[in-house]
Amino acid sequence: MTNPLRGEVIRLYKNLLYLGREYPKGTAYFRERLKTAFMKNKDVTDPEKIQKLIDRGDFVIKELEALYYLRKYRAMKKRYYEPEH
């Protein structure tokens, strides 16, 4: 793995690990799945393929953030509005 891409991969892993703390199924579940996903691609050496994987990881980060914002929005909505029957 080339040096700049190695730093990007480590940054991505750390960001995903940080976001996994709030994952609905738990931190341990998320950490295990994350480790498995990264270990599956540990032997990839093609810079283009690595960049595609990094882009996919960035997409996952955006999806997780959207999931968390939606969950927080729903919690706030439940607190301030009466349920409709």
UniProtKB/Swiss-Prot annotation:
Which InterPro entries does the record match to this protein? Complex1_LYR_dom, Complex1_LYR_ETFRF1_LYRM5, ETFRF1
Any one GO CC term of this protein is: mitochondrion
Q: Which Pfam families match?
A: Complex1_LYR (PF05347)
**Biological processes, Gene Ontology terms:** negative regulation of oxidative phosphorylation; respiratory electron transport chain
The Swiss-Prot or TrEMBL record describes its family as follows: Belongs to the complex I LYR family.
- What protein does this entry describe? LYR motif-containing protein 5A
Instruction: Name the species this protein comes from.
Output: Danio rerio (Zebrafish)
Q: Which gene encodes it?
A: lyrm5a
